[in-house]
Amino acid sequence: MGLMKKFRDYFLEEDYEDYEEEYEAPQPEEEALPKTAGKANVVSLQSVQKSAKVVLAEPRVYAEAQEIADHLKSRRAVIVNLQRIQHEQAKRIVDFLSGTVYAIGGDIQQVGTKIFLCTPENVDVSGSISLDGEDDRPMKRW
């Protein structure tokens, strides 16, 4: 051990002499304040209303259906106007969006001629709209 002492004295001579062992006295623990469980679960109704959004979409090609589905996945309601797209493409978009709303637990409703309302599960829609010329007859596949 003599070699180690010489080595330590040579390299740590100044630091070793000034070294004082620091000792911290244990501090008394502060009393923990009881947390109120009720406040953590309260959500302001005003903040919920501000975050709700409705997106208007008027796709021109089938590929834009993916963007509409992304809005639905982000919990936004989408009104889709299919009046400016060919009938076959519009049917494909409705089929795609029907699968999307089914997967997320949402709903799709026709609110006008070639106009659909797609909603995620967090949006409730009440009431119904009768289309022109249709009273209580079952809806035909448009």
Swiss-Prot record:
UniProt keyword list: Cell cycle, Cell division, Cytoplasm, Septation
Pfam family, one: SepF
Main location: cytoplasm
Superkingdom assignment: Bacteria
GO BP terms: division septum assembly; FtsZ-dependent cytokinesis
Subcellular location: Cytoplasm
Record's GO cellular component terms: cytoplasm
Function in brief: Cell division protein that is part of the divisome complex and is recruited early to the Z-ring. Probably stimulates Z-ring formation, perhaps through the cross-linking of FtsZ protofilaments. Its function overlaps with FtsA.
Similarity remark: Belongs to the SepF family.
Subunit structure and binding partners: Homodimer. Interacts with FtsZ.
Protein known as: Cell division protein SepF
Species whose genome carries this gene: Geobacillus kaustophilus (strain HTA426)
